[in-house]
Structure formats: C-alpha cells, structure tokens
Design a protein with these regions (language model features):
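Short, membrane-interfacial amphipathic segments enriched in basic
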Residues: 2-22
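Peri-transmembrane interface segments
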Residues: 66, 270-304
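Transmembrane alpha-helical interface segments in multi-pass membrane proteins
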Residues: 20-29, 33-41, 48, 52-53, ...
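Short helix-coil transition/hinge motifs at the ends and kinks of transmembrane helices
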Residues: 12-14, 83-91, 212-214, 268-274, ...
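Short cytosolic juxtamembrane segments of multi-pass membrane proteins
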Residues: 28, 412-427
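Hydrophobic, regular-secondary-structure patches
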Residues: 57-137, 144-147, 179-180, 230-231, ...
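Mid-to-C-terminal secondary-structure elements
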Residues: 139, 144-159, 169-270
C-alpha cells in the first residue's frame, strides 16, 4: 500500500514537471523571432568571452614558444663604444671585456647564480660531403650556458667541461644545419664537418626553435667549446658577452647596477658614461610580456562579461514584456489558487532556460572555433593551444545560471505583484 502511494506521488511529481517544462517551451516559442533575438544576445556574449579567453591563451602559448628554454631570470652584459673621455682616454674608444672580469664580478656579487662568458662569429660556412650550409653563426660557450639558453638535444650531447679543458674540436649543430648537411636524416654524431677550413666533430643536434636567442639563432648556430673558440679564432682573453642569472630573491636590475661600476673602474671608463656598458635585462622583458598578457586577459573578461551582461539585460527586458502580455493569465492563476512563489518560479525558470540554452550553444560554438584555430596552427613552428580550461568552462556555466536568475528577478517580482482583480479588470 505504501509502495503504491509512493508510485502515485512520483507520477504526479513527474506530471507536474512535464507540464511545467511544456509550458516553458510554449511560452518561449510563442514569439519565435523575439526569443531568437533575445537568446542571440546571450549566445554572442558567452561566445565572445570564451573566444577571447581561449584566443589570448593561444597567443600567449605562441609567444611563450618563442622564449622556450630561455632563463627568465637572466641578464647579459657587453662592451660598447665610450661616449666620454676619461683619464687620458679619448671619447669614442672601443674596449673589450676580459676573462679577468668574470672573476671580478663573481667575487663581488655572490647573488649571481650562474656567470659564464661567450664569444661568437657570424657568416661562417659549414660543409659535409657535397652539402653546404652558408650564413651560419658560431658560438663558443661553457657548459653552464645551457642553463641560460637550454638546448633541445634530440641527438647526442652538449659541450662539457672536458671539451673545454682539452680544447676539443667538437660542435653541436642547429636543426637547420643538420637538415642541410644530413638530408637523409642519418646520425651525425662522430662525423666531421668543415667550418671555414677547420674540421669539427659533431657531438649533438640542437632542435630548439625558439626565436629568442643570444649571439645566433639556434637552428643556424654551431656551438663549440669556449676555449676552442679562443684558440682557433685568436680571441685571446677577450670576451664579447657575459651571461648570468640571479639567485632567488635578487633581481637582474640590481645586479646590473652593481656590475657597471666594477667594469668601468677596471677598464678606465667614466663613471657617468651611459653608453660604454651594454646591458640587456631578459628578466624585465619577460615581466613585460607577462604583464601584457595579464592585461589582455583582464580586457577579455571585461569585454566578454560586458557583452554577456548586455545579453542578460535583453533577456530581462523581454521577460518584462512577456509578463505584461500575460497579465490576465497570471491574474487568473492567482484567482484559482496559485501561490506567488509558483508564479515567481515559473518566470525564473523561463529566464534561466532561455539564458542557459543560448549560453551552452555559445560555449559549444566557441570551443569549435578554438579547435579549428588550433588545428590551423598545429603544423607551424610555433603551435599554440587555443583552449579553455575545465574550470573556466564550469565558471562560464555558473555565470550563465546566475545571470539567468538575475535576469528573471525583476520580471518575477513584477508578476508576483499582480493582483487577480486588477489583472482581470485590465483585460
């Protein structure tokens, strides 16, 4: 008996729900054009929001791929022509960094984590067998340099301390050089390539494709031990560039401010010469890029939410018109016993259904567009992920529900305020 009564109750409840949803559908489709235009505002708002967020993430990925493997807390210092005369030295003097400067800076600045010198040559030509790769660059480095500009080694290894100590004629070649000299895709390790008349044994292939680099683009760069570079190309004690990273809690800007006076004092440069010492603060550049994308994301949220809010206001206005048109219907319901909360629930349900359905369609279409954009960039050298996170999608759904409820509040309260007698008299 109890089971039978429970079944009857469930059937009644289902019937009530079916009736309510049927009524919502009839109300929304009563004026199809108006409902479509109202829903389109919400659809476009959520579509813009998702596309802007996913698009900004994709662009950020593309930009980040250009900095791939580059230390974000790094800085670089080199020499430049002087702009002031000092202690008998004329203005416009050229000077060079020296090996001694490395030890001077290392002793004076313990906040530097990695400090390594490097030299470079441009316009070199590499040949192997009958194949030739021209317009290459050559870079002499220490093993520590890999912590500043991390190579992507798919074959072989990088320069090590034994290579530097023994002045070995070994090299790591870039991806483009490898593809030109070894078009059959064979393993180049152990093979000797001719670089401007000097033979070097290949020990690795660097396939890094990042567009941010120092002293040469990775795909067209031949990397050799620093000591070999000094010996083979008569650099002596000269250094073209000092590369360094800061320990946690220290900034590159402060380090560079302390490096300058050390170098100026050692090389007889005027203390107020702003040109003689050349500094590049990669940490500041990365910070600017991060701030740029933070600003883009904030702007995307503002534009997307603003458009979505405009759509929700449109829903609210249309629901107000709908309530006005249904004044008599609502009055009759009140007269035959409908509670104010029932009327309010009905209006809110209609508003939320209209908003949610339009919003879900907008999310689906936006995800489809982002997927097409990702497929379109998949074959490029800088692939990007034009996607939104799971939690962003959940957040968008919650925003839709909240806006749908808020859009229906004013019309719902107006419907609750309708008195049966006045509604019938209004008709």
């Amino acid at each position: 008996m109890i089971l039978f009564s429970s079944n009857i109750f469930v059937m009644k409840l289902l019937k009530i729900d079916i009736d309510r949803w049927e009524e919502i559908l009839i109300t929304i489709t009563r004026n199809k054009t108006r409902s479509f235009l109202t829903a389109f505002g919400v659809f476009w708002g959520i579509f813009m929001l998702i596309c802007l967020m996913g698009g900004s993430q994709g662009i950020q990925d593309m930009m980040s791929s250009n900095f791939e493997g580059f230390a974000t807390n790094s800085g670089f210092t080199g020499s430049n022509q002087t702009s002031k005369a000092y202690k008998g030295f004329r203005k416009g003097r050229y000077w060079s960094l020296e090996i001694k400067d490395v030890e001077r800076i290392r002793r004076a600045l313990p906040e530097i984590e990695i400090l390594t010198p490097s030299n470079a040559r441009w316009g070199v030509k590499a040949t192997y067998d009958k194949h030739e790769s021209s317009s290459c660059s050559m870079k002499g480095v220490y093993p520590e340099y890999a912590q500043i500009e991390t190579p992507t080694l798919t074959i072989g290894r990088f320069i090590n301390h034994i290579d530097v100590k023994e002045r070995r004629k070994v090299c790591v070649i870039g991806k483009q050089i490898y593809e030109t000299l070894f078009p059959d895709g064979s393993n180049p390790c152990g093979q000797f390539i001719n670089v401007n008349g000097i033979y070097y044994q290949v020990i690795g292939v660097n396939t890094s494709a990042g567009n941010m680099s120092v002293n040469g683009w990775p795909p067209t760069t031949i990397t050799i031990p620093f000591s070999t570079m000094q010996q083979n190309y008569n650099f002596g004690n000269q250094i073209q560039l000092l590369s360094y990273t800061a320990r946690p809690g220290h900034s590159i800007k402060n380090i560079q401010e302390r490096i300058e006076p050390i170098l100026k004092q050692a090389h007889m440069i005027h203390p107020e010469d702003k040109q003689a010492v050349m500094n590049v603060n990669a940490e500041a550049l990365f910070g600017m890029v991060d701030n740029l994308f933070k600003g883009i994301k904030i702007l995307s949220w503002m534009v997307g939410l603003g458009t979505l809010l405009a759509g929700a206001i449109g829903v609210s206005n249309i629901m107000m018109v709908t309530v006005k048109e249904r004044t008599t219907e609502i009055g009759i319901r009140r007269a035959i016993g409908a509670k104010p909360l029932d009327i309010m629930s009905q209006i809110l349900s209609e508003s939320m259904v209209l908003t949610t359905v339009a919003g879900m369609l907008g999310i689906s279409f936006a995800v489809f567009v982002l997927q097409m954009m990702e497929i379109g960039t998949a074959q490029s050298d800088t692939p990007a992920h034009f996607q939104i996170s799971f939690w962003m999608a959940i957040g968008a759904c919650i925003i839709l529900l909240v806006l749908g409820m808020l859009a229906g509040l004013a019309p719902a309260y107006r419907a609750m305020a309708i008195k049966p007698i006045e509604a019938i008299r209004d008709e």
